[in-house]
A protein has these predicted regions:
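Terminal, non-catalytic protein-protein interaction segments that mediate quaternary/complex assembly
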Residues: 1-171
């Protein structure tokens, strides 16, 4: 993935970590990869959260997505999700792709939970990398991205202006 492949990343995202994690995602999407990250020092998730148990190394049905897009580019079944994690889903549940008649591929990302201050910029950047890769390998131009956030939250310690939001109820 080259810098020309993706749009300007949101402020606060880790470009190197995002590229490392998305490369691992695609390398492991067909179950032929070890489940531990090959470059943990580069991983955004491992460096920031200490997690080496990400939902990579398992099937995200990438082959089925490519098949759907190649058979019928306007397929409503062009969905990328990890069916093995349906009872313990990661924050990003799925990526749904929809193409236009002009060869543009849009992506809707559904998150069951979103840490807006710390993690959402990284999710946006990594989702854009995933869209760029899917487009490049399937002959589309990247289109718009839509994010559906459930349980969007900001942790108090991550707020830049905590004092402005502190309520003193007195005694």
């Amino acid at each position: 993935i080259e810098p020309d492949d993706y749009r300007t990343p949101p402020l606060g995202c880790d470009i190197q970590g995002g590229i490392a994690d998305v490369a691992w995602f695609f390398q492991c999407a067909d179950n032929r990869c070890i489940t531990s990250h090959p470059n943990p020092d580069d991983s955004f998730w491992i460096r920031h959260f200490g997690k080496d148990a990400l939902p990579y190394g398992h099937s995200w049905n990438l082959d089925a997505l490519y098949e759907n897009l190649s058979k019928e580019s306007s397929s409503r079944r062009a969905v990328l999700f990890n069916h093995r994690d349906c009872y313990n889903p990661p924050c990003v549940i799925c990526y749904q792709f929809q193409s236009t008649i002009h060869g543009v591929l849009d992506c809707t990302v559904t998150l069951r939970s979103s840490d807006v201050a710390k993690v959402l910029p990284q999710d946006v950047f990594m989702s854009d990398l995933i869209l760029a890769w899917i487009c490049r390998t399937n002959g589309f131009e990247p289109g718009k991205m839509t994010f559906n956030l459930a349980n969007a939250h900001v942790f108090y310690q991550d707020m830049e202006y905590q004092e402005e939001f502190t309520i003193d109820f007195g005694d």
